[in-house]
Swiss-Prot record:
The keyword Transmembrane helix applies. The gene is wtf15. Residues 19-78 are annotated as: Disordered. It is found in: Spore membrane. May act in meiotic drive. The chain crosses the membrane at residues 85-105, 112-132, 162-182, 187-208. The keyword Cell membrane does not apply. GO terms for cellular component: cytoplasm; membrane. Keywords: Membrane, Transmembrane, Transmembrane helix. Belongs to the WTF family. GO terms for biological process: meiotic drive. It comes from the Eukaryota. It is a multi-pass membrane protein. This is Wtf element wtf15.
Amino acid sequence: MSNNYTSLSSSLDEEMGLKAGHEIDLEGSPPSEHNSEEKSTLPSNSDILTSANPVSQASETPDHSIESNTGSTQSPTSHSLLLKFSFCIVYYSYFAIVVLGCVLPFEHTHTFLIAFLVIFGIISVILFSGSIYYYETWTKTVKHFLKKVISPFKKEYIVCAFLKTFVFYGLLKTIEHFLVLLSGDKWGWKCSTLSSILTPVSCISFCLNESVQLRSCSTHLFINTVAWIKSLGGGKNAFENNYNQLNETSPEDLV
């Protein structure tokens, strides 16, 4: 039986193969790099998918260390709860003593005292529970405020603020003493509670004054006095140098 096979390559294909530098062999075997032996070395589809998406398998396995760390940070310790509770008790005990000290020494009706104690008890419970609930918030706020206020200070400014508070407290106690001698214990209770309230308020006010208005009159006098005392051993030139150095410093240099 004669073979009627005709080649699929035409004269045009042969010319194109000669121009390209190689001849297209349509009758031969496939190229060597695509034989069946090397097909087995190619990675499978599952290997390609796992190598392309390694995060999905890692995310499926739970990390117990992360869960334990988050659980430990979210659950408050007994030490912090005890500190929070005791601090709020001390703070509102002081508040209750001051408020009750302003009201109880005077003559009031029985109905007024009952109404006052009920209203005061409700307000105290609300403030006490709110202070415990927002303990971390307002303590962080106070720390941030004190850091911003005290950081640009030198020691002289802090000492001046507390000296002003001490003088103010001494003035209140002197007035209280004279009022007790003149009119009895009635005005003594008033001035005592007033001094208990105004002392921390005045301390905060003086510190704010020193932070907003640096080198107020009394602070400037105090710093010049300290510079004069330090310059006693060095003579007049040392005093002038210290005075000029203090006047030339800006608030930005105090940080």
